């Protein structure tokens, strides 16, 4: 049973156009019989690999790239260019012929009489006449001769000319020169001969002889000078060299040789190998060289058969080739051109063609008949259309063989071999070994390191499994991998944890043991991946043990969380803890009244009971609760907002207030250093500020406060300036009656509003949308307050005294509770009861006497008193009364009348 | 003729009267001028009348002026009264049969404070919800119970001088029990007053703490054996101090100073004297009427007046007297029963009620005293004893010094601790020898009235004493004229004037002047001049006569 493969397409070898190759040849069973099995092979269009010079068009590889874009054939007017795969073919356009296709059909140049390279031009449009325009190195009527004189050949102004039937060239030398290119002088010189060293005598040598001087004197230069000075009658035969002087003479100039050995060996300035002697002492004497004209050997006409016309004689140097050389005609040879040479075409060497003779060189060229090739047309034609396969070009060789110029990717004598590894790059990263398996070629890939897969197109992934520790990112690369460590890890495989618990130098240059120990020396640091764990001491907390526990407690109490922006501020606060009480209002001032009130005490928190005139009061009805930013919740008896007004009806303790209260120190904020109940005693219309006069009532004691009232009334109008209502001043932000303190604080708040764009939260705010200063703005408030100074001295702050106000002065005394109260004596736990009891206190407000002082401004003199005193003074001193003024008026009137009369006259 | 005579008299008077405008009215040339001057006269007379009214009204309003003087002189040292805040020794109350009722009260109150109530005669069970009401009722009940016990029977439970005062010195000189006057206060028990007796003459010639009274007191809230000796109703450990002038009521219940144990209480006092004016310039009184004066033994003060008024109100409403206040000779003290205690409770402040009880300021008609001395105290504290002080005392009746020989304490520190819990030092001194004297005097006296009246009269009418004499003279002349029937001549008759040679001479001159004026054509002006001259000369002649 035979297996036969049949191509599915006329395109070879795999079905792609223009000899395209297939990267994956498919075979299909067409028929199968007992005798044979026939497969049809083809190529999927997507797998066609186009040869260089072809591209995909309508079908794969069906378009041949244009190779005639730059007119490779020549002038487009005469040539017709056809593109081929990576080449082109040239032909003459219709109507033209000749080698350069410039000759029109029917003209004299149509037969191409001129040599290749020359230009043929018709003469007068005749069919017979033509003119050949030769190239620069051509000559002859049809430019059939090479012009050897086109390139410069002659030297020393020699003249080149073609001779011996234009088969050779010759230089006509000017006088004094000889040789084929006139390169050889026509004289023969002998060198100077050293004669001896003699003593120098200026009187006999230097004074009269012919001489010249040269610092670079050599013997040759002196010899040339002697030749120049020689004439037909006088011959300079001796050279005398004394230092840099050359003296020439017919006879020797000196012959004194005494003591010459020590002074003669002075080297010449121009040639260290020669001796010139020393001036004034010794001179070297040479015998001058001679110059003879070389004989012209061509004078003998028998040389080179010149007389016979078989060659030409060239004069040459006498010691070389006997003084002449021969240039023979093409048909002659030999030393003297005496031997004849037959013509190249006689007999004809062309076996199957016509012999063409080249006269210039006596060479032949065979023009073979059809069907024959070779130098002598001895070989029959071998190239046919089937000789070279797959687009290869067949060229017949001179030895009778042929050569196929295959397209790319095709190999073999007949271009029948396809190397699969040469196209398509089947092995991307490896070595390809081609194998032949039927009509389809196959390959085996030996992959390089780092690659895998059938075609070695898959890079080995070294990241499977992941070699990087702690789930770091592995990035594969050629022959390896790169681990991109997560923060806190290092090493090739990220297997090393960077230890953050290392000493470092802080901004002040101080070494810190670990980051955990910047504040807390007792902290322990444990390293982790991109982190560290600090075990803090008992005074510090937070991640790095740099947050004071007190600060954290404060922040948790204020904000409910640790506000990082406030930590630095609070750290500064720890250096000066007394500031914290001043800073708290800047935080609580941001809250609403209801929120602040909820943070502070209720009446039930502070009061066990309160009594007035020995009668217990109702906390909800008689005690008014209000909130201040600094003081918190305050409780006022007889507040102005209450409907009922209690009056003081009797003096003494039984006519005053008594209260039994609690300080609740267990619920104090940690920044309060003292425990007491602040007692403010004021007129009911006055507003209480956090800076108003207060009295402290101490725990575990009864504090008795005796109050004394003083009332002030002032005169307004022209007697002075006083204020009756808050509306009389520019701004007044506080409820109740006008007070100087309130007015000054109003000025202060206006200044804070102007400077810091917010108001101090420690005082009540102005109505409207004015915001309270926050903790971050506290420094602005502090600086502005210090810069502004006392509000009472500001030019825009006018705060007169009120027209009427009351002041209370207080004296106090104190007595402690008994050591064992009866309620604790009965208690089961005495110590706990006592600890609870000493946190309480009693306050007693007493008016010892009912009388009080009134300081009232009265006018020192009223109108009536003024009249009385005026009348008294006038009456006593001058007896003047009111009628006196009228009498004076009458007197003046009379005088006026009298003067008028006199003037009238 | 009579009418003519009066007119003549008035004319003569008006010519020489010093009252303003009157001569002008009499000598007016025409009717318009006369009306003008009459109008002026009426105007100034009206103004004078108005000003006179103002002066009289001001005088009868009796304004007062307070003069302030700052005096610097030697002063009599004030009376200093000290009492223990615990009125009775609890150990004696528990053991003495005379105090059995008080002991029962204390026991019932102690149980009530821890929530155990029982039916008792004082009604403590009624205040089981309120601590204050319970404490208040118990304190009142204690006063009432103690009032039933005679002073003699109280002596064992009271603190003696030796119990209370361990050391006493005045200006560095030791003082003794004889310098103190003892009295029994209904609230504080035994109290001792220094310099109260008139026979004592303690005075201060230099100010400062070195020249005052220094007392070391022990209140013994805890005995040396560790037992508590304070009554259950006593809440404070210390002494009650009163500073007042001699003869005044101490008023400890109302106005005393609290001095606590464990401290030295330095009490500096400054004196203020008030001298007030009586009616009509002021309202001060020297004493109340005898019928309503409950504090006859003391100098009158507003406080004594108010206390008496309150006592009368209590008697009127409760039919019994409050022992805290002074009792009259015919008054009966309230009994320590629930009914009386409830009645006393209703008399306390209830201003919010629709029927409030007595307002002393409005209903008592109390007036300030005409002479009053007030001491204003200022208290400062120091720790007592210091840790290294061994508490030296010369008294042998008390606990004694903290020396090694004291057998009452096991160690010196125990002794110091006892003194810290039970002892104190009181220093009372004059802050300065200068004191303020406020004297209320009449602000507008008769002298002021006369001054102002003279000025106003002089300005408007030109009136003076001379004018008054003139008026008097006019009245006498008119009277004489009426009596004699017009026989007296005040001026010569017209005929006599014509015969007088001086008048003739004047007439001759007049003729000549008229003649000259005719020549110059200035007849009218010349006549006017002559008339004036004649009138002037006539006046001179009249005056000469």
Curated annotation (Swiss-Prot), chain B:
Inhibited by the diuretic drug amiloride. Keywords: Cell membrane, Disulfide bond, Glycoprotein, Ion channel, Ion transport, Membrane, Sodium, Sodium channel, Sodium transport, Transmembrane, Transmembrane helix, Transport. It holds the Pfam family ASC. Residues 56-457 are extracellular. Its main location: membrane. InterPro entries: ENaC, ENaC_CS. It catalyses: Na(+)(in) = Na(+)(out). The chain crosses the membrane at residues 35-55, 458-478. Residues 514-523, 534-545 have a biased composition (Basic and acidic residues). One of its GO terms (biological process) is sodium ion transmembrane transport. GO terms for cellular component: plasma membrane. Residues 1-34, 479-545 are cytoplasmic. It is found in: Cell membrane. Can form homotrimers. Heterotrimer; forms functional heterotrimers producing channel with different properties. This is Degenerin-like protein asic-2. The lineage of its organism: Eukaryota, Metazoa, Ecdysozoa, Nematoda, Chromadorea.
């Amino acid at each position: 049973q035979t297996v036969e493969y049949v191509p599915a397409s006329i395109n070879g070898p795999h079905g792609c156009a223009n000899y395209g190759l297939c990267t994956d040849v498919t075979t299909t069973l067409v028929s199968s019989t007992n005798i044979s099995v026939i497969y049809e092979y083809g190529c999927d269009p997507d797998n066609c690999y186009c040869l260089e010079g072809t591209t995909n068009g309508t079908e794969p590889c069906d378009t041949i790239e244009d190779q005639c874009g730059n007119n490779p054939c020549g002038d487009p007017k005469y040539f017709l260019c056809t593109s081929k795969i990576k080449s082109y073919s040239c032909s003459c356009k219709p109507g033209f012929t000749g080698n350069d296709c410039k000759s029109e059909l029917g003209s004299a140049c149509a037969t191409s009489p001129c040599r290749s390279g020359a230009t043929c031009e018709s003469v007068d449009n005749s069919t017979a006449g033509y003119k050949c325009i030769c190239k620069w190195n051509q000559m002859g009527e049809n430019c059939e001769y090479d012009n050897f004189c086109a390139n410069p050949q002659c030297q020393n102004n020699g003249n080149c000319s073609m001779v011996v039937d234009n088969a050779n060239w010759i230089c006509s030398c000017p006088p004094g020169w000889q040789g084929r290119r006139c390169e050889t002088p026509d004289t023969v010189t002998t060198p100077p001969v050293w004669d001896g060293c003699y003593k120098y005598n200026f009187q006999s040598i230097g004074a009269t002889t012919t001489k010249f001087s040269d610092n670079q004197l050599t013997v040759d230069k002196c010899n040339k000078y002697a030749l120049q000075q020689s004439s037909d009658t006088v011959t300079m035969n001796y050279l005398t060299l004394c230092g840099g002087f050359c003296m020439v003479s017919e006879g020797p100039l000196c012959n004194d040789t005494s003591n010459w050995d020590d002074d003669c060996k002075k080297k010449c300035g121009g040639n260290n190998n020669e001796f010139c002697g020393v001036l004034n002492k010794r001179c070297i004497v040479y015998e001058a060289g001679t110059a003879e004209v070389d004989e012209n050997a061509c004078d003998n006409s028998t040389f080179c058969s010149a007389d016979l016309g078989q060659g030409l004689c060239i004069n040459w140097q006498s010691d070389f080739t006997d003084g002449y050389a021969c240039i023979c005609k093409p048909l002659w040879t030999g030393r003297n051109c005496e031997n004849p040479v037959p013509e190249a075409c006689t007999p004809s060497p062309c076996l199957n063609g016509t012999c063409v003779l080249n006269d210039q060189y006596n060479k032949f060229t065979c023009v073979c008949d059809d069907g024959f090739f070779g130098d002598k047309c001895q070989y029959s034609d071998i190239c046919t259309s089937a000789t070279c396969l797959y687009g290869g070009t067949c060229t017949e060789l001179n030895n009778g063989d042929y050569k196929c110029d295959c397209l790319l990717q095709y190999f073999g004598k007949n271009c029948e071999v396809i190397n699969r590894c040469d196209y398509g790059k089947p092995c991307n990263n490896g070595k390809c070994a081609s194998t032949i398996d039927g009509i389809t070629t196959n390959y085996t890939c030996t992959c390089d390191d780092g690659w895998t897969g059938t075609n070695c197109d898959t890079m080995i992934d070294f990241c499977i499994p992941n070699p990087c520790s702690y789930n770091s990112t592995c990035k594969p690369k050629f022959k390896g991998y790169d681990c991109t460590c997560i923060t806190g890890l290092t090493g090739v495989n990220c297997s090393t944890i960077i230890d953050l618990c290392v000493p470092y130098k802080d901004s002040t240059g101080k070494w810190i043991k670990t980051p955990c120990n910047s504040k807390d020396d007792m902290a322990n640091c444990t390293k982790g991946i991109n982190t560290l764990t600090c075990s803090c001491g008992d005074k510090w907390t937070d991640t790095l043990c740099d947050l004071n526990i007190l600060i954290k407690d404060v922040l948790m109490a204020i904000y409910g969380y640790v506000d990082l922006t406030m930590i630095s501020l609070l750290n500064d606060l720890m250096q000066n803890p007394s500031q914290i009480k001043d800073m708290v209002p800047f935080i609580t001032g941001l809250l609403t009244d209801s929120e602040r009130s909820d943070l502070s005490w209720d009446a039930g928190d502070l009061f066990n009971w309160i009594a007035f005139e020995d009668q217990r009061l109702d906390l909800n009805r008689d005690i008014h609760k209000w909130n201040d930013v600094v003081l918190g919740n305050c409780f006022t008896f007889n507040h102005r907002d209450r409907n009922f007004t209690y009056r003081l009806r009797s003096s003494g303790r039984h006519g005053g207030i008594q209260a039994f209260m609690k300080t609740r120190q267990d619920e104090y904020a940690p920044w309060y250093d003292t425990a007491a109940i602040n007692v403010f005693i004021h007129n009911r219309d006055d507003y209480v500020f956090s800076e108003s006069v207060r009295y402290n009532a101490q725990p575990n004691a009864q504090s008795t406060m005796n109050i004394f009232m003083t009332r002030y009334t002032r005169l307004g109008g022209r007697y002075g300036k006083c204020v009756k209502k808050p509306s009389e001043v520019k701004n007044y932000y506080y409820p109740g009656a006008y007070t100087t303190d309130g007015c000054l604080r109003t000025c202060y708040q206006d200044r804070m509003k102007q400077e810091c764009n917010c108001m101090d939260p420690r005082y009540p705010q102005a109505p409207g949308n004015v915001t309270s200063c926050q903790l971050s703005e506290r420094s602005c408030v502090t600086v502005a307050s210090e810069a502004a100074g006392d509000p009472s001295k500001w030019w825009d702050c006018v705060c007169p005294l009120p027209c009427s106000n009351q002041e209370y002065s207080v004296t106090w005394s104190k007595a402690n509770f008994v050591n064992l109260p009866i309620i604790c004596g009965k208690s089961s736990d005495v110590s706990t009861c006592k600890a609870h009891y000493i946190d309480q206190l009693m306050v007693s407000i007493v008016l010892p006497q009912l009388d009080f002082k009134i300081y009232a401004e009265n006018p020192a003199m009223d109108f009536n008193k003024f009249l009385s005193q005026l009348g008294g003074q006038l009456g006593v001193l001058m007896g003047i009364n009111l009628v006196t003024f009228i009498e004076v008026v009458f007197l003046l009137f009379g005088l006026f009348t009298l003067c008028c009369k006199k003037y009238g006259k | 003729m009579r009418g003519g005579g009066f007119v003549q008299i008035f004319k003569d008077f008006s010519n020489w009267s010093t009252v303003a405008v009157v001569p002008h009215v009499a000598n007016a040339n025409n009717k318009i001028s006369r009306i003008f001057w009459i109008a002026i006269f009426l105007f100034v007379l009206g103004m004078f009348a108005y000003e006179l009214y103002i002066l009289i009204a001001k005088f009868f309003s009796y304004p007062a002026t307070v003069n302030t003087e700052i005096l610097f002189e030697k002063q009599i040292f004030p009376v200093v009264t000290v009492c223990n805040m615990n009125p009775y020794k609890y150990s004696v109350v528990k053991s003495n049969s005379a105090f059995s009722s008080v002991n029962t009260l204390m026991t019932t109150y102690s149980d009530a404070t821890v929530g155990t109530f029982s039916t008792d005669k004082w009604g403590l069970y009624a205040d089981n919800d309120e601590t204050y009401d319970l404490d208040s009722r118990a304190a009142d009940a204690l006063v009432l119970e103690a009032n039933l016990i005679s002073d003699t029977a109280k002596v064992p439970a009271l603190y003696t001088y030796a119990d209370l005062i361990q050391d006493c010195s005045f200006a560095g000189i030791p003082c003794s029990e004889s310098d103190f006057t003892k009295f029994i206060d209904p609230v504080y028990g035994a109290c001792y007053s220094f310099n109260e007796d008139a026979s004592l003459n303690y005075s201060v010639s230099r100010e400062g703490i070195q020249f005052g009274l220094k007392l070391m007191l022990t209140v013994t809230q805890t005995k040396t054996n560790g037992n508590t000796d304070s009554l259950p109703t006593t809440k404070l450990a210390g002494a009650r101090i009163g500073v007042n002038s001699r003869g005044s009521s101490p008023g400890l219940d109302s106005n005393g100073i609290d001095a606590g144990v464990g401290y030295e209480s330095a009490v500096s006092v400054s004196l203020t004297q008030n001298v007030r004016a009586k009616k009509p310039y002021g309202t001060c009184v020297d004493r109340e009427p005898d019928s309503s004066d409950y504090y006859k033994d003391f100098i009158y003060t507003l406080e004594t007046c108010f206390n008496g008024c309150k006592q009368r109100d209590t008697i009127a409403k409760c039919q019994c007297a409050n022992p805290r206040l002074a009792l009259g000779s015919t008054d009966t003290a309230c009994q320590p029963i629930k009914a009386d205690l409830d009645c006393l409770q209703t008399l306390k402040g209830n201003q919010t009620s629709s029927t409030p009880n007595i307002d002393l300021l409005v209903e008592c008609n109390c007036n300030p005293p005409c002479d009053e001395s007030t001491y204003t105290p200022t208290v400062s504290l120091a720790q007592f004893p210091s840790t290294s002080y061994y508490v030296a005392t010369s008294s042998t009746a008390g606990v004694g010094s903290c020396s090694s020989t004291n057998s009452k304490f096991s160690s010196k520190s125990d002794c110091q601790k006892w003194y810290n819990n039970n002892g104190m030092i009181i220093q009372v001194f004059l802050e300065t020898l200068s004191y303020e004297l406020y004297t209320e005097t009449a602000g507008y006296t008769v002298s002021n009235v006369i001054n102002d009246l003279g000025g106003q009269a002089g300005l408007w009418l030109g009136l003076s004493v001379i004018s008054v004499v003139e008026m008097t003279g006019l009245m006498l002349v008119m009277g004489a004229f009426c009596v004699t029937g017009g026989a007296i001549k005040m001026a010569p008759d017209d005929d006599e004037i014509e015969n007088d040679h001086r008048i003739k001479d004047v007439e001759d001159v007049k003729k000549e002047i008229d003649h000259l004026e005719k020549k110059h054509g200035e007849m009218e002006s010349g006549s006017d001049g002559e008339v004036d001259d004649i009138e002037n000369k006539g006046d001179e002649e009249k005056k000469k006569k």
